Amino acid sequence: AWLRDEGITPIAIEIPVFNYPLCDADPLGSDAKRLHQSIAYAGTVDGVGLDSKGNLVIWDWKTGGLYAEGRMQLAAYAGALHSLAQTQPDLFRAIADTAGVPRTGYLVQIPREYSEGMDPWKVETVEEWELDYLGGVFNSLLPVYQWQHEVREAEKAEKEKARSDG
């Protein structure tokens, strides 16, 4: 009902996305989250569609709360979709035909329990400029995240070695 009310025509649901050039996975396979050691991120876009003007839009269903991090998540998905549309146009034809650039993102909160008189959903709109901006922020934070991960793994390996030596 929300899609119809917004004038959105779905073209794909549950699309696995990833930073393709760094990922060791089959774009359509179930192992889309099996990552190369240097991969930055992977995830699943809940929905991709076209608005009434033919612009590409994406959305993410949320059964919990709507948080600021969800906006950055949509921006990461938007960047990954754009990359996939450029590198795999035959697999992502409907997306590639729109240049693979989402113009709008939606966080759609669906209540876990519904009662009479309650709004069936709450929606936060993420405009194109914010998707672009947050995509840049996300990409800037990836090296920090990767460094933290490497430090934790090295510390874990040191503790295991000390335990086995001790």
Task: Name each model feature, range by range.
Residues 22-23, 81-166:
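Metal-dependent nuclease catalytic regions and adjoining charged, substrate-binding loops involved
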